[in-house]
Amino acid sequence: LNAYTTGVMFKASLDIATDRVFNESGETVSNPSNWPTNLFYFNYNFYTSVNAIRKLALNNLPGDITDNSTTEELARYSIKRFKKTENYSCYYNYWIKHLDNNSPEMGVMEFGIVRNNIYRLSVNKVAGLGSGEPFIEPEQPDEYKAELNINIDVFPWAVRNQDVELE
């Protein structure tokens, strides 16, 4: 389960193209200072509200899906919410794989930090937009494809021999 899996969460700042943010009228909102606290992402565009998505891109979106819907409810329709703090951020979860069990279901000690090892993580590629919230589904038992391509090097601790004379 993810609740017992060792991983890392990366936080990235979004650099949103100003011609990709739309209001309910379908106009671009090109001045970032006019963007709301929450931006909603759907089908490679950002919207100022869920209602803007409903009007411009997803006409069959149920009326009970609103700006205040949960992350899980929005995800059912491939919508992501990004909250503005100092900027808009996204998050990527990556589980640290120590030993591969060659199964899509997480195995015991497959993901974890093992003592006397050093782990170096190198981000090679960002394959998509991360989550708008720092969220982990603790009950998820299966591995899933991360939006990041990461190279992991595991180095065992080195033994340093020293001669000692006791007097």
Please report, for each region that a protein language model flagged, where it lies by residue.
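Extracytoplasmic cysteine-anchoring/structural motifs
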Residues: 1-167
